[in-house]
Amino acid sequence: MSNLKLDVHTADGKTNGTVELPASIFDAEASVALMHQVVTAQLAAKRQGTHATKTRGMVSGGGRKPFRQKGTGRARQGSIRAPHFTGGGTVHGPQPRDYSQRTPKKMKAAALRGALTDRVRHDRIHVVEELVPGQTPSTKAARAFIERLTDRKSVLVVLTREDVTAWKSVNNLPQVHTLVNDQLNTYDVLNADDVVFSVEALNAFINAADKTKEEAK
């Protein structure tokens, strides 16, 4: 497999050279089942799991028998906190639990490669030199630049932590979700229509992926 190439876009609407996308990351096998499993685990891990209902033993009251056993013509009852009474306990209701699932690192990495491959194949990954020219943050300029890159609604922007100007420029854009390069994950890639990398963030992501691959050998 040969490496892919993408143009590097500048803030003034031009291009400034190209970048190589390693085939091992951006031209991998895209397994829908694997991506689904990883995304499901990621969403499950975000759940608090603090839901709780009271059983009949937890509800206050209901200590005495509501009426005598015989002679009333009604069905016998032992407590007004039985589940079929209003204000009674809940049967088989949700209790606090941990929803997190164990997902091996190699599965997460493979799913992310599959998600990035899918976005590249559909021309939905863009690389930019900088989001705004100079060192002055500008939400207006960042919005205009992103709209020139894509007309789709949801955009994931991947930046380095040091790119403070870009962070401040896109923070208030409702259609833009921003991540640091080492936080890139399958769910956010698939949830966005397009992915925009800064050159620095792309290089940092590729270098980290290569380092992880070497350590795994």
From Swiss-Prot:
Keywords: Ribonucleoprotein, Ribosomal protein, RNA-binding, rRNA-binding. Residues 46-103 are annotated as: Disordered. GO terms for biological process: translation. InterPro entries: Ribosomal_uL4, Ribosomal_uL4-like, Ribosomal_uL4_dom_sf. GO terms for cellular component: ribonucleoprotein complex; ribosome. GO terms for molecular function: rRNA binding; structural constituent of ribosome. It comes from the Bacteria. It holds the Pfam family Ribosomal_L4. Part of the 50S ribosomal subunit. PANTHER family: 50S RIBOSOMAL PROTEIN L4, LARGE RIBOSOMAL SUBUNIT PROTEIN UL4M. Belongs to the universal ribosomal protein uL4 family. One of the primary rRNA binding proteins, this protein initially binds near the 5'-end of the 23S rRNA. It is important during the early stages of 50S assembly. It makes multiple contacts with different domains of the 23S rRNA in the assembled 50S subunit and ribosome. Forms part of the polypeptide exit tunnel. This is Large ribosomal subunit protein uL4. It comes from Corynebacterium jeikeium (strain K411). The gene is rplD.
